[in-house]
Amino acid sequence: MGSAQMKSVIVTGGGSGIGLAMSRHFASEGHNVAIFDVNAESGAKIASELSSKHPNATVTFRKSDVSSWDDLAAAFKEVYEQRGSIDIVMANAGVSEQGSSSAVDLSEAEPTKPRLKVFDVNLTGVVYTVKLASHYMNRKPKTANSRGLIICTASNAGLYPFPVAPLYATSKFGVIGLVRSLAAPLAQHGIQINGLAPAVIETNIAPSKDLFKDMVITPMETLIRGVAQFVADPSLSGEIAEIHGSEVTLRPPHEYADADTKKNIDVFNSLGYA
């Protein structure tokens, strides 16, 4: 799925941070880009700016909350009806835990309910996005290469322990598990799914720029190279690209502990249920 042909692209969380970089990238290549974001004011402004800067592209904005099935489903349907196809979907919208994690607080006299918005957006929102993307991609005629590509934004916090934000880390571990587990069933329909696991990239997801002052920052350009690699090569699916420094490293899944474990997983797969 190269860039020579204009594609219909959706970017969730496409109005800021990593999503904005993705929106800019696809607009610069002359694609039809639909930006989904909860911030209506900035999203509409960005769509207008990108349209002016890249007249060969079509850039639109729709206010959309990925944690709402009804809202997101309506947004996907609108794009499909307007364009007739959906080729690339960036399941990118995400939030951080913001402050101390509510997963465990041993200072409380009485336990309070954990704040789970990070799951609603980062994991449930990605599940919703993937389901809708695959539904509309599957309506396309099957070609030799691809019916469509889904790229999910995870994090290297989904690869390593991240004690300061355990719920955020859990949501990103979940995204990685979703990508790896859906690759085979989606491949049967000519759809690819991959994930990005970026290291520290300076974005507005952080509560303050002070957070980054002592960090090693990964350039946004490295992440965009990872995106371009997945777009260019439809043979890649179920892959997680760790984005770190100037490197894009495809991280393989864990090896099976033993032959029995592999056999059991293979049996589950052959049965088609668990």
What residues fall within each predicted segment?
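Amphipathic alpha-helical dimer-interface segment in Rossmann-like NAD(P)H-dependent oxidoreductases
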Residues: K77, E81, D120-A144, A183-A184
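Conserved mid-core segment of classical short-chain dehydrogenase/reductases
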Residues: S96-L116, P141-N145, V164-L167
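Catalytic Tyr-X3-Lys loop
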Residues: V95, S107-V130, I151, V175
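Active-site-adjacent segment of SDR/Rossmann-fold oxidoreductases
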Residues: E29, Y160, A169, S181-I191, ...
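The beta1-alpha1 cofactor-binding region of Rossmann-like NAD(H)/NADP(H)-dependent oxidoreductases
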Residues: A40-E41, K63-A75
